[in-house]
Amino acid sequence: MQSYADTTLPAMGEGAEMTTAEERRLGEDIAREIFRDPQFLEDPILYEYVNSIWQELMAAARQRGTLTAELQERFAWQVMLIQDATVNAFALPGGFMGVQTGLVAVVTSRDELASVLAHEMSHITQRHIARMLAQQKRMSPVMIAGMILGALAASKNPAAAQALMIGGSAAVIQTQLNFSRDMEREADRTGMGLMQPAGYSQAGFVSMFEKLQQANRMNDNGSWPYLRSHPLTTERIADMQSRLPNNAARQPQDTGMVAQMMSARAKILSKPEPTVLQQWAQWVQTPEFAQQTAEQRSGALYLAAMANHQLGRTAPAQAALDQLDTLVQAKPQAVRQAQLLRADLALTARTPDAALTALAAVVPTAQKSFASQTTTISSATTGLVSEAVISRGADNSLSISDADRDAPLLPPAQPAASTKGQAQDRTQLILLAQALAQLPTAQLAQQSSLLRSASNGLQTVVAQTPKDAAAWQALSSIFRVQGQPLRAIRAEAEARAAQYDYAAAVDRLRAGQDMARHSKERNDYYEASIIDTRLREMQALAKEQAARK
């Protein structure tokens, strides 16, 4: 195990050599490369689960004062999922957070996952990254970005890391990027303080530490890189144990069905070997399965359904889904996840009718969105929408019809925090868009109501969270099936911009300009004017980004 070197922390003021704006730009450059990586995972179901924990911890950090209003505004606070079986999570400059599927796969409760995210969030709120990078005084931002990307690659593939490293060996650079013991202790204590206000048990911190310690005792085969960047010490573990409330006996945690189901999903998304899939598919038929708790059985059935589906075994997959439905029927959130799984597997099998049926059974919040033909947003969002297309209702709220709605002209620096209901709507809307895009053209005319609802709902999502690339991409697919190619192109451009690929955004906007010149549609005039404005903005951002290379 790589040891830590004791270092003296610079005073907070000394970290000012890297301003919040500089750190944000550095983070964006790193995030852009991660978004381009084939291992970047766009899975709305797992993302909703991880991001919901992240948002609850952010709310707790604001409440406790560890996340200031300035830092919340200036940093991105974006979670990125990485499709990798190794157990890792990492905070990046500028408020970006990477979570690998291997980590979600090994935790057994929301509390354990929250403990890791709270720790990493505290590295960000305490400006540990800026303070650490301030010590690399002779290095340019490009070199620092290369160091960080190289260190991330080293956790997965040392050979690939060498191609990214700048200015030294992988081992030396990894040492430079590790947080000091004092920083780790501060992140532990600050992170643990977020748990209870966010609705999580502080015992999750200790159980996660014990899980990491157990892995640390074993011969490390490289599957737990989190241990190398965050080495455990007896002192750290004892400190966390001593901070548990006296009245909090070490009782078995209520792991919860949803946590088990999301752990199962992460296992499948980590791309296991076919032999492993076969073991998971068959385990629900063993006597040991019947002896598990209801929570554990829900995860095993979810796992078996996905494993059988990937192995092409339709009947066993359906049987596992049916068993899962029976098991979770008294747990509303677990019922919702079971229906989302049905929709997801139907989409993978390219049976959109089955996906639509499953989505129609999902509901609480999203049904209202699907049923409405007009979306009303508060006057607080007026600056995000083109003045030319807004009409005011009698109650002075802003109502934007499907025919005239336009997306943000000037997206804010970071996405607004979504409520739980809005996050759930997002998941269902993205899956709905995928299902509608798979329908044969002849069937689309029968789904005009759903198309309008999906369009309205997704436009609300991107108005609230302009950096949501997946929502923009889903909206683009809806615009295409609605016969609005110009709007589809602009939504594609916004998706690229949301992933900080401004050059690609410029390319799509230019294509939109060319299309607009040849269009005779009246409504395209408004869209063309927005494209012109966004193109100028993207060109400026692309130029600035290129200058940093």
Q: What do the predicted segments below correspond to?
A:
Residues 30, 117-126, 190:
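Active-site His/Glu-centered metal-binding helix of metallohydrolases
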Residues 97, 106, 124, 247, ...:
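TPR/TPR-like alpha-solenoid repeats
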Residues 12-14, 28, 40, 48, ...:
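Extracytoplasmic and endomembrane cell-envelope/extracellular-matrix remodeling and assembly machinery
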Residues 108-112, 121-138:
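Catalytic Zn2+-binding segment of zinc metalloproteases
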Residues 1-90, 173, 215-217, 314-328, ...:
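Hydrophobic or amphipathic, alpha-helical segments that drive membrane association/targeting
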Residues 141-156, 163-172:
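Membrane-active amphipathic alpha-helices enriched in small hydrophobic residues
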Residues 46, 133-145, 160-163, 199-209:
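Acidic/histidine metal-binding catalytic segments
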Residues 98-115:
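Short pre-active-site segment immediately N-terminal to the catalytic Zn-binding motif
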